[in-house]
């Protein structure tokens, strides 16, 4: 193994006169080279474009070099070597937590480095910083100020520094915070993960070149950060690997085989990846910039000399000489970046033209918006057209639509229950699953599904058990006035009370669920309106920026739907009060005995024969036929009778009396008995006798549906309590049937859907536009809004000027390519 002292000797100073002569001759050759002049103009154009992109938040695919690595892997030293001067003279660990965009400009007139920092919120640069020690202080202070403002440990917002110097290349590098395993004292524990995530985000764009640094003392197989680089660029196609502090490894090489194996890095980086091996001066004493650059050059020379003379057999110079030394890396980075700049110039020019056009359009829209703040008539017209368009889209969604995609905007039954906050149906213990419950629906389809779900829930409720005390309190009160009448009225009163108690919450829940379905249509109508305008490229007024107006439209629509729900609740409650009135019993009783739709509901989740509800979800195929909600049960002559086909012994009471018939036809039976009863008995006794003498088979109620039993096992042998309970269940079923089939369904449709189709645009128009101009303009011009719009226009104008300047410069560059 070679002695380590043989390759590092104390640097000696080059005579000042000879050094100045070398520098002057090099600068003269650079100034006379037309290729370098062309490269510099291209580099300057990209630098200005990069500054504009940082200032205005533009996402431009500018070729850039991103330096990544561990916090102690020598990134700062490499940047200083590229700059040609030291800026962290005091060797203080900056520990920056923000990216640093370092724009190096080869300026022959800058015999001393001139560093300027771009303003945080502008594309302008500050005054030149002459003191090298001030550079690190500015980086540190800016980082601390931003992190304190954002209350974060790291920030992706970059610091931009422009360094003009005669001894630096035309190069731009983004220095990233170094990877760390553990947070510094006072930092959050998540800081290492946040740094890793931010660096990956900065290095991921495909137009960026990765400059990955790793100390030579770290073996490839145990590299902690090499895996992170592989996640960003798995094939290393855009990664330049730099082995830093290479001088620390030289003493371990004894023969050529060891050196060549190490330099090839075979088995870890792939066959086409050749890392660069760099060593930099370790002397951190205060020296001049010229001496610093001389030491860099001397270290390169000493490393090559040691590999040639200090290692037995030397090394494969033909294969590895171009990858060793800082000078080789600097030349490669500069040439590689210039090559990428040249390749990207046409695409950059096209992108700049597109961005300039977009900014011009934004300027026109902003001018129109500022002008519109004083044109009330124009705003009224645009707002009315927009509101009418939204209302029309709501109507179209109610009538049935497939745009936008129901898979994205629709909801299943479970999602509706959860998002509405209503949950299950009150008083229903079973899980109600209407047809198509698993499909994502909206609009009219979702409305009809909720209606059917309400029907299923209503028919799942049985008449609740009644205590003997309640029966006795009603029955015994009528004991002295005829037992038959007492039994009938007791059962009817029990049924009416149960219906009011159990069906009223169902009606309120149905209204709330339907209101949620209609309320959800506003967002879908907005999306539909946006898609339609985009699809047909309609030149309608852009209302996107008027937040106050959009909030007002949303609030008006929400109030409209809530008012509909309130009105519908009152209507269905009125129907419930009517059907549970003692005077309505004769109507639904007679109709029932002639055969009504009620007989079809022998299971809680079955629809009536007149209801059409198609099961479209896949789950229905696997269920037994008897559980199909949308298929009516098979008819049984012994259990139900077709409406209008009753037996001759039954009295037909029309559901809706004909205008040509007097009302006495409907209630003639009762009136005749009141006026002409031969036995002198009152109407109530006659009614009790009429009900008691009908040929009705005994029955029982199961799951809310009517199940007929044999007459031999009927009420003849039952007690008065059992008779009343059975009769109450019968009355409850009749009340429920009349309420659901005749009243509620049609009321909900006419109470919700018809107003949304016919009155929505009028209601919104009255709320929004039937006001004076001052109140109307409050939706569009908030206090100070005009000043904000004017400031936005100034920013757009500034952005337009910068981008136009970059475009002109790139056009000049493109002509020279």
UniProtKB/Swiss-Prot annotation:
Residues in Dynamin-type G domain copies: 59-346
GO biological process per UniProt: cytokinesis by cell plate formation
Region: G4 motif, residue numbers: 244-247
Region of interest (G2 motif), ranges: 95-97
Binding site residues for GTP: 69-76, 175-179, 244-247
Segments for region (G5 motif): 280-283
Compositionally skewed regions (Basic and acidic residues) per UniProt: 618-629
Biased composition (Polar residues): 1-20
Tissues with expression: Expressed in root and leaf meristems.
Subcellular location: Cytoplasm; Cytoplasm, Cytoskeleton; Cytoplasm, Cytoskeleton, Phragmoplast
Location, primary (coarse class): cytoplasm
Induction: Expression is cell-cycle regulated. Expressed during mitosis from the prophase to the telophase.
Ranges for region G3 motif: 175-178
UniProtKB keywords: Cell cycle, Cell division, Cytoplasm, Cytoskeleton, GTP-binding, Hydrolase, Microtubule, Motor protein, Nucleotide-binding
Region of interest (G1 motif), ranges: 69-76
Region feature (Disordered): 1-37, 405-425, 616-658
Phenotype upon loss of function: No visible phenotype under normal growth conditions, but when grown at 16 degrees Celsius, seedlings grow slowly and root tip cells form incomplete or twisted cell plates.
GO CC annotations on file: cell plate; microtubule; phragmoplast
GO molecular function, one term: GTPase activity
Keyword Lipid biosynthesis tagged: no
Hydrolase recorded as keyword: yes
Matching Gene3D superfamilies: P-loop containing nucleotide triphosphate hydrolases (3.40.50.300)
Role noted for this protein: Probable microtubule-associated force-producing protein that is targeted to the forming cell plate during cytokinesis. May play a role in cell division.
Family according to the record: Belongs to the TRAFAC class dynamin-like GTPase superfamily. Dynamin/Fzo/YdjA family.
Name assigned to this protein: Dynamin-related protein 5A
Species per Swiss-Prot/TrEMBL record: Arabidopsis thaliana (Mouse-ear cress)
Protein encoded by which gene: DRP5A
